[in-house]
Every structure is written in structure tokens, then in C-alpha cells.
Amino acid sequence: MKTLSAGLLALASAASAHYTFPSLIANGVVTGEWEYVRQTENHYSNAPVTDVSSEAIRCYENPGRPAAKTLSVAAGSTVGFTVSPSIYHPGPLQFYMARVPDGQTADSWDGSGQVWFKIFEQGPQIDPSGLTWPSDGLSQVQVTIPSSLPSGDYLLRVEQIGLHSASSVNGAQFYLSCAQLTVTGGGNGNPGPLVSFPGAYSPTDPGLLINIYWPIPTSYELPGPPVWRG
């Protein structure tokens, strides 16, 4: 019984150190869990993705998940995700978007292909004492939809990468979700560069294979393409 109890405590401790992004925030309103966000495979375990070559790195969708709804938001507005329970591991925060192809819908499109562009990245503050990550401890994260983004249906992908064990290959931990949006009032921008998931990252990218503790890094290279500023 003691062994079983210890095992359950260990599992509970591991789950509490991990996290999900279950709810979309729009117009200051927190929507229901997995209402506009595709339910992720870790919705019970909170466990991360560690293989950047797997299909899970795209949206980490739970097989047989309930269909999510699509929320209408204005270009130039701020949207976000809740974090359950909160961001625990040190690492960067990034947001990507992908436009749903003509003839398809946000609730059924799988997001495959070279279609993703980055709209936000947040790295560390660096000083001689170490790296400080602005996303540490957050229970909500937000991003502005570029005002020149063309109107249409999109997937919005949030990603926070835990680098506490990233000194070995595949040690980086990816926590992510995809929400379904219809962007209105957009412009005539041309988002890019475009990447695919999987494909955007290599397990040996400098921002994914790194000891963030010692020797203290003097720089940090965020993984993925440059941000499209709109």
C-alpha cells in the first residue's frame, strides 16, 4: 500500500509541474475549457511533447476529441489562453498562426503543410546571474492578432518550451494548444516565412539543445522562423 501511495504521489507531483492551455480568451472573456481550443492529448496528464518530429508537435490533438467551435475575433485585437494550472518550467513563449485553405473549415482542417507563421516570440532576460523568463508563473498568456492579417479562418497555436532538462537531445518539453478563429476586419498583409509542424524545429537547434543553468548563457536563439510583424 505504501508503494502504491508513493507512486500515486509521484504521478500527482509530475502532473502538477506540467500544464495545458485549455481555454481561449477574447474581449476579456475566458471561454470554456476546450470550447474553442482543440482538446489536447495531455488534457488529463498535462505531459509535454518531446519529439519535434512527431505529428503531436503541431496541435497535440487528442484522438477522437470533441469538435471545437470557431470564435470570431477582429484583426488587431488581443486574444489569449489560460494556463492550467500555470507555467512552471523556464523557457520561451511563442505564438503561431496558419490560415485554413479555401474549401476547408477551421474545425476539421489538420494544419498540415508549410502554412504556419510566427506572430510573437518571447525569450529570456539575460544577465550575469542567469536567465529570467517573463512567462514564469503566468496563468494567462496573450497576443495581438496582426492588424494587416487577411480576414479568414485560422488556427492559433500557443507554445511554451520548458528548457529545464534541455541539456540532452529531446530534453526540451513542449506545452501547446491550437485554437480555432475567424479573423474579421483584416488587411492585405502577406504572412511569412511559412514553416510546417513537424519540420520547423530540429532537436539540435541551439534554442532547444542548451544548458540554461551552467555555464550561464550569454545569448539565446529562439527556435523557429522570425516573427511576422504584419
Curated annotation (Swiss-Prot):
Localization, UniProt: Secreted
Q: Using the chain's own numbering, where are the disulfide bonds? A: 59-178
A GO cellular component annotation here is: extracellular region
Tell me the Gene Ontology biological-process terms attached to this UniProt entry.
cellulose catabolic process
Pfam families per the record?
AA9 (PF03443)
Under the heading CDD domains, the entry gives:
LPMO_AA9
Q: Which domain of life is it from?
A: Eukaryota
Would you tell me the protein name for this molecule?
Answer: AA9 family lytic polysaccharide monooxygenase H
